[in-house]
C-alpha cells in the first residue's frame, strides 16, 4: 500500500526549477536520453497494426501501446508494472511514456547540423573563420579541406579541388591530411584550441585600427568566449547521433478504408534511416569512393530536411507536392508550438453563443442560457447531487442530468449563485475584452449582455458572438470577482476616464429628458421638489420640457467627511428634476441642470467616481441606463425623410461656385494659370462651397422659431430628430447630416487624388448614375482599408506587447531625483492639452515652487490627484518635473512612484501590476481607429504651409526664449538666432500660445511687451532666407569677382541690378577656391568686431545668394545684406495614422533626416567634392574639429562663422530619433516620441495617457553600447542590457575599480523584442530558428523573469496575484530551501487509490 501511495505521488509531481538553459547536445547526451536505437524504417505492421520491432514505433524502445500491457499480451494489469517481458522485450507501464521516451539513430557518417551551418551568421563559418561557400563545398563533397598540413606548404583549412588534391598527393604523399564531408569539418572543429585562439584574437584586436576588422574580431571573440564559458564543444555542431522524437508526438492514425494519416516527420525519419542503412551496407562492402560519397551527401541532405526542410536547396515534398513539415517548422510561426499551443490554448468548460441586449440586467450580471449553464457547470452539479444524496454514484448523477429531471434545475440554480463566469469577445484588444459577470439563468439560446459594457467589448448586437468561460478553483473565482468583475472596471486603463458610459438610445433618452422648450405646457409652475415634478408629469399637467422652478436639496461633502444639506429654488425643467431623483447624494445639481449630451454624462459619471467612489457610481450608471431607455421610448424619436431639411440657399451657393470655376477655366485657357494651379483652385472653390452649404444647413436644422408666452417670436434649439441625435452624441455627426441634407461634396479616386467634379446632390435628393458611380470608389476603398488596417493594427499590438511584456512594478520607490519636465502642449495659438491633464496621476520629482517665490507649493514625491491639480491651476504653475518610468532607477521592472497612478483604479499603482502589457494594449487597442493612408498635400493645404507672420489670438505678454536679435534703423527687432520661440503669457504667467520664429523675422514688439489679441507680432518672407548684419558700418566685398564668383543680373521691369553668387559647380577654375563674403568696416576701413567677441564681422555667402547692395554702401544693424532664395518645399507626403505610429516605435530613420550639429562650436566650410560640401565645426576651446559631408541640395540653416550648440538643426527635415538620443539625451527622445505618437492619436480624438508611451520608450532604451570597458569583463562596442551595466558599475564602484562608460541605444520594438535577455520570449516572437541557434551556441540561461516565459513553461506569471508566489520562491531560494511539497491528506490518497484501481481493473463504466 505504501509504495502504491509513493507511486501515486510520483505521477502528479512537477519539477521545480528556477531557470531553463539551452545548449548543444553532445553525442553521449543524446544516447543517454535514448531508450534504444531505431534501426529500421518500418512503422507498423499493416495486417496486425502492431508496431514493427526496431522500427520507428517500436514498443521495445518507446513503451507499450496499451496501458500496463506488453505487446505479445503475456503480461497485463497493474500487478506486473515495471516487468520487462522476456518474449517481446516491452516494459509493462503506462502508455503515456510513448510521449516522453526518445530513441536515436547512429549515423554511419557525421552530418552537419543545418541550423549552425546556414542560419546567418553561420556559426561554423564564424568559428573556423571560413566562408560559408567553402564549408558547403566541403560538406556536400565538392572539394577537399586540409585538416593537418604537416611539413608541407599547405595551410590548415585550405580548400583543395579534386585536381589540386591529386597533385598534392603525388607531391607530398601522406605527409598531409585532407578530407571532405562533415568528417573533415568535424576534425577541424575538434582540433581547435578555443582558449589559445581567443588570446590570439585579443592580441590582434589590440593592434588593429580598422573599424571593420575590429567588428569582425569582436564577433569571433564573443563566439569563442561563449563556447568556452558554456562548456559547449564546437564539434557538437556536427551530428554523429540523431535523436528520434517520441512516437506519440509524430502519430500515425488509421483512417477508415485502411489508409493511414501520418505526421510528415515519419517520412523524413524514414528517409534518414533508409539512407543511413544503405550507407552502412556500402561501407561494409567497401564500395567505390564515388558511390559512398554520393550516399553520404544524400544522408546529409536527408538530415537537413528533417531538421529544417527548405533551408538549403529545394524543399523535399510529400506525395501531394506540398513541402514536408520538418522539426523547425513544428515550432515556428503562428501554427508552431510556441504560438499555437504554449501561448494560447483552447480550454475546457467554455462555450459560445450569439449575444442580445439585456436592458433589465444589473451591471454585474449577464444572462446565461439554461442549456449552456447546465453543460458548463456539470461537474458542480454532479458533486451537489451526490452531496445531497440524490444520486448514489457519479454515473447516476450523469443519468439524472441527461434526463433533465426537475431537481437538476434547482441544483443548477444553487450552483450558479455567486459563481462568476467570464465573458470574452474576440478580438480581445485590451484587458476589458474579458470581464466577469454573475450569471442569471434565462430561457432561449442567446447570451444576454448588459448594454453599458458594450463600449469596453466594442460589441454590438448585429450577430456578434461571445465566449463564456467558467473559473473553477476557489482562487480563480475570487480573482474573477475581485479583479475582473465588470463593476470593478469602470475606468479605462488607457486614459483613466469612465468606459462604462451610456451610448445611443440611453444618451438620446437623457438628452430628450433634459432639453427645455419655450412655452411648454406647465411653464412657470413652482414645485416643492422632484417628487412633485414627477407627479405632475405623470398626471399630464406639465410636459417634460416645461421650464419650472423646483426646490432642490443638494448634499455637499466637506473635507472632514460630514455632508451638509443645502436647499434652494432652482430654475430648471420638469425632466431635469425627475432625473435628479436618481443622482446620488453628494453631487451638485448643476451637473444635471443642462441638456445632457454624451460628454456631459461621461463627466457626470467621472465626477461621481472621484467624489463618491465605486459603489454609488455603479448604482448610478445602472439607474441612468434604465431611465435613459424609458425616456427614449417616451420620446418617440424617429427619422423621416422630412427631417432632412435642405437649405434654401443651396442652389445659389452652387451656382456661384460654378461661375467661379468657369472663370478659372477661362484664365487657364488664356494661359494665365497653370494646370496644377487651376486644379487646386477648383478644388478649393468646391471645398469652400461645401462648407457654406453645410453651415446653411446646420443653421437651418439646429434652431426653429416659436412663439413664447408673451406672444413674441423667439428662436430655440430645434427638436428635429436627426439634429437631436447628432447634437446629443447618440448617433451620427454633422458630416453625415451634411451628406443627407447638404451636398456630398468632393470624392477621391482610388489612388487618393481628388476628383474635381463634386457631387452636388445629397442623399435626400438622390444621386444620378454618374454621381453614384463616383461614390462607389470611396466606399470600396473604405472597406479594403479597414481589412488592411485590422491586420496591421493587430501586428503593431503584438510587437508592443512583446517588447513590454516583462515590465512589472517591482518596488515602491527607487528614490531617484530624475524625472521629465511637463509643460502644456501648445501648437500655435491653441492649448492642445493643458498641464492638468498631463500631470494628473503622476508623482512630483522635486518640490513645486509657487511661481515667482521660493514657497513650496507641492512637496517632492506627492501623487498629483485632482485636488493638487486644482492647486497648481490656481497658482498658474506652468511646468512641473514629474517622475517617469524612463528615468526610473529600478534594476528589473519599475517602481510605483515613477509610474504614478493606476489609471483604472485611481490610486497609486500596486506592486506586481503588469504595466508593460497594459501600456501595449492601451496603445494598440485604438490602432484600428487610426487611418492607414499617407496624406498627399495639395490645393488648400499646401498654400497654408508657407506662413509669413505670427498673429496672436489672446491678449498677454510676449516672452522670447533663446533669442538673439538686433534693433534695425526703424526701431524694430530683427531676430538673428535659429531656434527662437515666442510664447504668449497671460497675467497669471500661464503660457497660452507658442510659436517658432524664423531667422530674419521682424518683430513689432519686443520681449516683455504687452499685446492685444489679434495683433501681428512678427513678419518674414517665407521664400527667402536673409543674411542680416548685427553691426553698423560700410559693406566691403571680398573675393567677389565678376565672372568668377558672381554675375550681375538686371531686372527688366524695375531696372534694378543685383549680384548673384555663383554656385561652386558654375565657377571657373580660378574661382573654385575663392570664398565670397561681405565684410563690414568702419569709416577708416578697419574691420568692425561682432559685439561681445573679438571676431571681425564678415558674412560668407553661399551659392545662389542675391546681393542688392553695392560695394561701400552704408548699413545699420538689422539690415538685410543678402537674400538666399528658398525653394518652398513642394507637396511632401505626410505619413499619418498607423504607419506613422509604427515608424516611431520601430525607431526608423526618416528618408532625409534633419542634420544636427554633433558638437558645439563655430561653423565653417572646408573643401567641397563633386556632390557634397564639407561642414566643419570647430569647438571654441580648440579641441578637434568635427567634419561631416552634406549633399549640396540640402538647404543649410547656418552661415559660415556662426556659432552652433550641440544638437542644433543645421539642415531642416524630419528628425531621426537616434540623433536626438545621441545629441540631446534620453529626455529629449522621450519627449519627441511621446509627442509625435500623441499627435497621431489626438488627430483621431483618441486619448491615451503619456505614461503608456513612456513605458514603451523605456523598453526601446534598454540596451547600451559600451564605450570603454573599465575594469569589467565586457568588450568595447558590445551591446549590453542597461540594467546589467548599472549593476556591474555599482559593483565596480564598491570595489574601487574603474567604472565602464556607455552610450544608450534606441532600438525599434521588433529589435528590442529579439534582443531581450530571455531567449524563450524572443523565440516565441519572431525568427525562432535564429534566436534558438544563437542561444544554444552561447549556452544561454533563461531566468524566467518576464511574463511570456512563465506562461510558456506553465507557471503563475510574476505579476498580479502571481507576484507574491514568485517573491516567496525568491525568498526560499536565498535561504537555500525549496518550498515544501504539498502534503497529501488521507482522504485524497484513498480517492486517488480508488481511481487507480478502477483503471487497473479495466473498469470502463462509460
UniProtKB/Swiss-Prot annotation:
The gene is rpoC. Belongs to the RNA polymerase beta' chain family. Zn(2+) 1 binds at residues 70, 72, 85, 88. Binds 1 Mg(2+) ion per subunit. This is DNA-directed RNA polymerase subunit beta'. GO terms for cellular component: DNA-directed RNA polymerase complex. NCBIfam families: rpoC_TIGR. The keyword tRNA-binding does not apply. Zn(2+) 2 binds at residues 814, 888, 895, 898. It catalyses: RNA(n) + a ribonucleoside 5'-triphosphate = RNA(n+1) + diphosphate. The RNAP catalytic core consists of 2 alpha, 1 beta, 1 beta' and 1 omega subunit. When a sigma factor is associated with the core the holoenzyme is formed, which can initiate transcription. Its cofactor is Mg(2+); Zn(2+). It comes from the Bacteria. Keywords: DNA-directed RNA polymerase, Magnesium, Metal-binding, Nucleotidyltransferase, Transcription, Transferase, Zinc. Mg(2+) binds at residues 460, 462, 464. DNA-dependent RNA polymerase catalyzes the transcription of DNA into RNA using the four ribonucleoside triphosphates as substrates. Its EC number is 2.7.7.6. It is an enzyme of class 2 (transferase). The keyword Nuclease does not apply. GO terms for molecular function: DNA binding; DNA-directed RNA polymerase activity; magnesium ion binding; zinc ion binding. It comes from Sodalis glossinidius (strain morsitans). SMART domains: RPOLA_N (SM00663). Transmembrane segments: none annotated. GO terms for biological process: DNA-templated transcription.
Amino acid at each position: 500500500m505504501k509504495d502504491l501511495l509513493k507511486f501515486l505521488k510520483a505521477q502528479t509531481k512537477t519539477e521545480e526549477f528556477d531557470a531553463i538553459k539551452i545548449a548543444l547536445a553532445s553525442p553521449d547526451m543524446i544516447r543517454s536520453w535514448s531508450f534504444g536505437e531505431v534501426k529500421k524504417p518500418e512503422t507498423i505492421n499493416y495486417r496486425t497494426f502492431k508496431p514493427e520491432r526496431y522500427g520507428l514505433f517500436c514498443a521495445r524502445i518507446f513503451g507499450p501501446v496499451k496501458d500496463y500491457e506488453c505487446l505479445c499480451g503475456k503480461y497485463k494489469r497493474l500487478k506486473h508494472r515495471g516487468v520487462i517481458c522476456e518474449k517481446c522485450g516491452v516494459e509493462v507501464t503506462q502508455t503515456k511514456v510513448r510521449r516522453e521516451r526518445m530513441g536515436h539513430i547512429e549515423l554511419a557518417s557525421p552530418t552537419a547540423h543545418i541550423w549552425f551551418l546556414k542560419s546567418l551568421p553561420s556559426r561554423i563559418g564564424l568559428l573556423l573563420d571560413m566562408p560559408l561557400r567553402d564549408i558547403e563545398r566541403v560538406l556536400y563533397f565538392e572539394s577537399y579541406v586540409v585538416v593537418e598540413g604537416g611539413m608541407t606548404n599547405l595551410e590548415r583549412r585550405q580548400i583543395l579541388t579534386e585536381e589540386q588534391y591529386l597533385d598534392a598527393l603525388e607531391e607530398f604523399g601522406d605527409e598531409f591530411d585532407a578530407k571532405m564531408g562533415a568528417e573533415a569539418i568535424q576534425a577541424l572543429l575538434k582540433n581547435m584550441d578555443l582558449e589559445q585562439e581567443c588570446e590570439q584574437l585579443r592580441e590582434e584586436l589590440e593592434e588593429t585600427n580598422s573599424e571593420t576588422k575590429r567588428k569582425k574580431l569582436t564577433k569571433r571573440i564573443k563566439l569563442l568566449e561563449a563556447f568556452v564559458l558554456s562548456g559547449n564543444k564546437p564539434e557538437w555542431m556536427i551530428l554523429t547521433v540523431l535523436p528520434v522524437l517520441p512516437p506519440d508526438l509524430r502519430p500515425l492514425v488509421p483512417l477508415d478504408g485502411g489508409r493511414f494519416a501520418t505526421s510528415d516527420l515519419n517520412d523524413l525519419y524514414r528517409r534518414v534511416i533508409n539512407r543511413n542503412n544503405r550507407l552502412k551496407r556500402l561501407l561494409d562492402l567497401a564500395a567505390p569512393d564515388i558511390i559512398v560519397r554520393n550516399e553520404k551527401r544524400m544522408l546529409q541532405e536527408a538530415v537537413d530536411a528533417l531538421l529544417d526542410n527548405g533551408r538549403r536547396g529545394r524543399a523535399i515534398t510529400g506525395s501531394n507536392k506540398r513541402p514536408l513539415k520538418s522539426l523547425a517548422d513544428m515550432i515556428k510561426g503562428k501554427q508552431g508550438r510556441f504560438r499555437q499551443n504554449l501561448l494560447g490554448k483552447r480550454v475546457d468548460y467554455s462555450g459560445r453563443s450569439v449575444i442580445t441586449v439585456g436592458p433589465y440586467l444589473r451591471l454585474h450580471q449577464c444572462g446565461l442560457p439554461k442549456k449552456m449553464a447546465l453543460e458548463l457547470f456539470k461537474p458542480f452539479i454532479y458533486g451537489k447531487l451526490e452531496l445531497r444524496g440524490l444520486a448514489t454514484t457519479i454515473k447516476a448523477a450523469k443519468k439524472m442530468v441527461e434526463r433533465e429531471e426537475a431537481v437538476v434545475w434547482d441544483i443548477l440554480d444553487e450552483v450558479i449563485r455567486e459563481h462568476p463566469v467570464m465573458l470574452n469577445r474576440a478580438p480581445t484588444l485590451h484587458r476589458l475584452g474579458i470581464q466577469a459577470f454573475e450569471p442569471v439563468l434565462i430561457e432561449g439560446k442567446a447570451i444576454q449582455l448588459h448594454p453599458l459594457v458594450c463600449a469596453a467589448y466594442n460589441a454590438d448586437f448585429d450577430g456578434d458572438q461571445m465566449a463564456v468561460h467558467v473559473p473553477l478553483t476557489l482562487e480563480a473565482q475570487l480573482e474573477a470577482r475581485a479583479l475582473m468583475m465588470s463593476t470593478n472596471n469602470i475606468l479605462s486603463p488607457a486614459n483613466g476616464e469612465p468606459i462604462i458610459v451610456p451610448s445611443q438610445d440611453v444618451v438620446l433618452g437623457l438628452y430628450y429628458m433634459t432639453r427645455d422648450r419655450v412655452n411648454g405646457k406647465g411653464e412657470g409652475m413652482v414645485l416643492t421638489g422632484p417628487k412633485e415634478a414627477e407627479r405632475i408629469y405623470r398626471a399630464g399637467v406639465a410636459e417634460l420640457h416645461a421650464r419650472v422652478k423646483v426646490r432642490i436639496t443638494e448634499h455637499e461633502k466637506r473635507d472632514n467627511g460630514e455632508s451638509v444639506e443645502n436647499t434652494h429654488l432652482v430654475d430648471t425643467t420638469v425632466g431635469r428634476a425627475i432625473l435628479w431623483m436618481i443622482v446620488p447624494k453628494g453631487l451638485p445639481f448643476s451637473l444635471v441642470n443642462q441638456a445632457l449630451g454624451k460628454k456631459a454624462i461621461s463627466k457626470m459619471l467621472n465626477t461621481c467616481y472621484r467624489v463618491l467612489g465605486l459603489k454609488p457610481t455603479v448604482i448610478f450608471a445602472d439607474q441612468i441606463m434604465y431611465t435613459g431607455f424609458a425616456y427614449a421610448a417616451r420620446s418617440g424619436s424617429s427619422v423621416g425623410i422630412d427631417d432632412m431639411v435642405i437649405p434654401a440657399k443651396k442652389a445659389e451657393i452652387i451656382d456661384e461656385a460654378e461661375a467661379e470655376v468657369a472663370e478659372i477655366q477661362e484664365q487657364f485657357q488664356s494661359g494665365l494659370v497653370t494646370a496644377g494651379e487651376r486644379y487646386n483652385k477648383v478644388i478649393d472653390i468646391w471645398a469652400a462651397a461645401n462648407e457654406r452649404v453645410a453651415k446653411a444647413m446646420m443653421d437651418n436644422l439646429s434652431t426653429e422659431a416659436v412663439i413664447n408666452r408673451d406672444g413674441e417670436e423667439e428662436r430655440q434649439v430645434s427638436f428635429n430628430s436627426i439634429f437631436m441625435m447628432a447634437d446629443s452624441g447618440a448617433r451620427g455627426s454633422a458630416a453625415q447630416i451634411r451628406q443627407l441634407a447638404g451636398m456630398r461634396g468632393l470624392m477621391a479616386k482610388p489612388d487618393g487624388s481628388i476628383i474635381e467634379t463634386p457631387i452636388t446632390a445629397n442623399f435626400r435628393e438622390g444621386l444620378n448614375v454618374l454621381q453614384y458611380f463616383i461614390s462607389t470608389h470611396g466606399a470600396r476603398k473604405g472597406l479594403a482599408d479597414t481589412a488592411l488596417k485590422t491586420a496591421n493594427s493587430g501586428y503593431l499590438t503584438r510587437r508592443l506587447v512583446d517588447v513590454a511584456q516583462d515590465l512589472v512594478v517591482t518596488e515602491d520607490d527607487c528614490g531617484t531625483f530624475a524625472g521629465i519636465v511637463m509643460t502644456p502642449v501648445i501648437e500655435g495659438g491653441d492649448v492642445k492639452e493643458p498641464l492638468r491633464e498631463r500631470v494628473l496621476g503622476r508623482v512630483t520629482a522635486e518640490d513645486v515652487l509657487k511661481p515667482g517665490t521660493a514657497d513650496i507649493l507641492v512637496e517632492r514625491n506627492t501623487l498629483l490627484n485632482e485636488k493638487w491639480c486644482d492647486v497648481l491651476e490656481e497658482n498658474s504653475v506652468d511646468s512641473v518635473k514629474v517622475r517617469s518610468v524612463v528615468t526610473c532607477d529600478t534594476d528589473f521592472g519599475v517602481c510605483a512612484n515613477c509610474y504614478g497612478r493606476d489609471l483604472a483604479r485611481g490610486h497609486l499603482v500596486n506592486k506586481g501590476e503588469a504595466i508593460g502589457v497594459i501600456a501595449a494594449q492601451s496603445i494598440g487597442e485604438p490602432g484600428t481607429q487610426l487611418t492607414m493612408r499617407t496624406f498627399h498635400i495639395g490645393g488648400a493645404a499646401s498654400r497654408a504651409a508657407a506662413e509669413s507672420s505670427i498673429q496672436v489670438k489672446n491678449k498677454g505678454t510676449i516672452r522670447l526664449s533663446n533669442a538673439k536679435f538686433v534693433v534695425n534703423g526703424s526701431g524694430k527687432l530683427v531676430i538673428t538666432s535659429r531656434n527662437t520661440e515666442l510664447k504668449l503669457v497671460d497675467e497669471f504667467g500661464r503660457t497660452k500660445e507658442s510659436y517658432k520664429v524664423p531667422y530674419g523675422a521682424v518683430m513689432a514688439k519686443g520681449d516683455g511687451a504687452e499685446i492685444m489679441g489679434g495683433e501681428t507680432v512678427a513678419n518674414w518672407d517665407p521664400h527667402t532666407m536673409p543674411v542680416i548684419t548685427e553691426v553698423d558700418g560700410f559693406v566691403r566685398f571680398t573675393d567677389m569677382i565678376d565672372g568668377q564668383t558672381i554675375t550681375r543680373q538686371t531686372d527688366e521691369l524695375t531696372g534694378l541690378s543685383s549680384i548673384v553668387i555663383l554656385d561652386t559647380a558654375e565657377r571657373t577654375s580660378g574661382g573654385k577656391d575663392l570664398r565670397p563674403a561681405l565684410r563690414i568696416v568702419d569709416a577708416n576701413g578697419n574691420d568692425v568686431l561682432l559685439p561681445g567677441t573679438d571676431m571681425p564681422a564678415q558674412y560668407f555667402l553661399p551659392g545662389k545668394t542675391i546681393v542688392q547692395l553695392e560695394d561701400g554702401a552704408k548699413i545699420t544693424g538689422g539690415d538685410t545684406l543678402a537674400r538666399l532664395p528658398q525653394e518652398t518645399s513642394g507637396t511632401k507626403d505626410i505619413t499619418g495614422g498607423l504607419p506613422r505610429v509604427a515608424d516611431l516605435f520601430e525607431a526608423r530613420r526618416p528618408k532625409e533626416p534633419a542634420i544636427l550639429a554633433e558638437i558645439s562650436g563655430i561653423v565653417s566650410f572646408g573643401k567641397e567634392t563633386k556632390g557634397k560640401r564639407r561642414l566643419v565645426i570647430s569647438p571654441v576651446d580648440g579641441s578637434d574639429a568635427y567634419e561631416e559631408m552634406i549633399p549640396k541640395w540640402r538647404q543649410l540653416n547656418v552661415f559660415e562663422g556662426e556659432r552652433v550648440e550641440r544638437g542644433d538643426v543645421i539642415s531642416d527635415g524630419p528628425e531621426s530619433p537616434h540623433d536626438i538620443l545621441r545629441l540631446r539625451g534620453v529626455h529629449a527622445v522621450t519627449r519627441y516620441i511621446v509627442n509625435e505618437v500623441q499627435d497621431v492619436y489626438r488627430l483621431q480624438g483618441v486619448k491615451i495617457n503619456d505614461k503608456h508611451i513612456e513605458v514603451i520608450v523605456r523598453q526601446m532604451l534598454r540596451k547600451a553600447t559600451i564605450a570603454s570597458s573599465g575594469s569589467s569583463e565586457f568588450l568595447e562596442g558590445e551591446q549590453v542590457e542597461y540594467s546589467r551595466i548599472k549593476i556591474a558599475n555599482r559593483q565596480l564602484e564598491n570595489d574601487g575599480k574603474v567604472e565602464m562608460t556607455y552610450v544608450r541605444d534606441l532600438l525599434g520594438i521588433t529589435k528590442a523584442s529579439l534582443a531581450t535577455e530571455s531567449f524563450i520570449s524572443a523565440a516565441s516572437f519572431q525568427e525562432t530558428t535564429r534566436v534558438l541557434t544563437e542561444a544554444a551556441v552561447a549556452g544561454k540561461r533563461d531566468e524566467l523573469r518576464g511574463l511570456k516565459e512563465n506562461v510558456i513553461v506553465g507557471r503563475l506569471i510574476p505579476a498580479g496575484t502571481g507576484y507574491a508566489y514568485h517573491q516567496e520562491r525568491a525568498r526560499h531560494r536565498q535561504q537555500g530551501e525549496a518550498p515544501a511539497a504539498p502534503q497529501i491528506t488521507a482522504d485524497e490518497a484513498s480517492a486517488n487509490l480508488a481511481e487507480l484501481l478502477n483503471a487497473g481493473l479495466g473498469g470502463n463504466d462509460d
